[in-house]
Amino acid sequence: MNQSETAIAGTPRRMLGTVAGALSFRLRTMTRNRASIAPIGLSAPWRNALARLYRRGTEVALAGMPPRRIRTTISLAGRCPAVLFYLPVLLHCLRLAWRHRGFTLPSVANPNIECGGFRGESKMSYLDQIPGDLQSWVAPSLRFVLRADASRRNNLRALQEDLKRAGLRFPLVAKPDIGSQGYGVRLVATPGDLRVYLERFPRGEAVMLQRYIDWQGEAGILYVRQPDEPRGRIFSLGFRCFPHVIGDGKSTLGALIDTDPRTRRMARRHRKAVLPHLAKVPPSGEMVRLSLLGSVRAGAFYYDGQDYVTPALTARIDEIARRMPDFHFGRFDVRFESVEALRRGEGFQIMEVNGASAEALHIWDPDQSLTETYRVLFDQFRLLYEIGACNRDRGHRPIGLAAFLALQWRESSLLRRYPASG
């Protein structure tokens, strides 16, 4: 969202009240009329089926993940247009900027990361700051810059040599070093897949190659520590549920995609992703994953995992975060073997770390109310501005607005140039 250094006293509160009132009315209307949750433009049978699903719920239980009965995969917040949904958040940020005298204070929430991790930072820069004795908690990765003055073949040869030295073997996950929302993320299972990926990757930019961790469980753990506090805490734990279908032993994969209310909404995307296998009949009870991405835009959904936060998990994440220089706010995206192991602070691998731009994933739980969603978001940004103000007082200088917008423009332009996600 566009950002400004100026806030008009009193205006944010009045506008916030107006927007909140409108959203509250929409929430009450949707609560009274369950059928209205279906996306506009769908046929009547589909609308009725989705309404029944919302009322009844269906249980999701993937390997390693806690079981969860869901009524829909889309939260009320997720149904709002982004411009409308984030307007109250922007107004809240303007109020915080007025109070703390600086709109770009989040850019110094993590002083050793470019822009505090708010825009345009290197993904690898986070992982590199985790000390060597804690690297066992990190998925092995390397960063490679595709030289603009080298041929595709020479870039591929150099990257393969780097992979060999790092001990990384296929399958691997390829992703841009600068990016967001899963753009450009693909599974590369063979050297041929890697060659095709690099052919479509912009030269002069950096790519990350990471060992593929074949665990179904994935979570986003948002961590917060004030600069003057000796210990941090887990602000949010949200589970990612990847788009998938469960075989019944009779239906083809294509039919399962078309009839499952959780996948039919993005059936065209899912069918394209598994095109060679659409006619296959998965055995009864077999889970077929439809995307590598744990992103809402790929059909994934998130649900609240706050009840699974334990002192042991908090201590482990705090140990890692405190060893990262001047790291105060960010989300650890992890794959885990089982929820029991995660609760013990064991059996997980860090795939990515996100900085100041990270959101609490549990706010996108389909059962989350708009009131609670905004409460969490407002609290999150309050902490972010407080941390930024404290670090500014310690001598760290926030980025200028023009420089921030330049980073925003660069990242947005890169997203359009990356290979298609897988």
Tell what function each PLM region has.
Residues 98-101, 137, 205, 244, ...:
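Short secondary-structure junctions and interdomain/linker hinges
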Residues 173-174, 331, 350-352:
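Short hydrophobic beta-strand that contains or immediately precedes a catalytic carboxylate
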Residues 256-344, 391-419:
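A long amphipathic alpha-helix within ATP-dependent nucleotide-binding catalytic cores
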Residues 1-136, 144-157:
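ATP-binding N-terminal substructure of ATP-dependent carboxylate-amine bond-forming enzymes
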Residues 216-218, 227-234, 326-329, 342-348, ...:
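Coil-to-beta-strand transition motifs
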Residues 3, 13, 28-35, 42-44, ...:
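C-terminal active-site "lid" helix and adjoining low-complexity regulatory extension at the edge
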Residues 143-144, 334, 355:
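Hydrophobic/anchoring residues in structured secondary elements
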Residues 112, 122-274, 310-314:
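Active-site nucleotide/adenylate-binding loops and adjacent lid/helix of ATP-dependent enzymes
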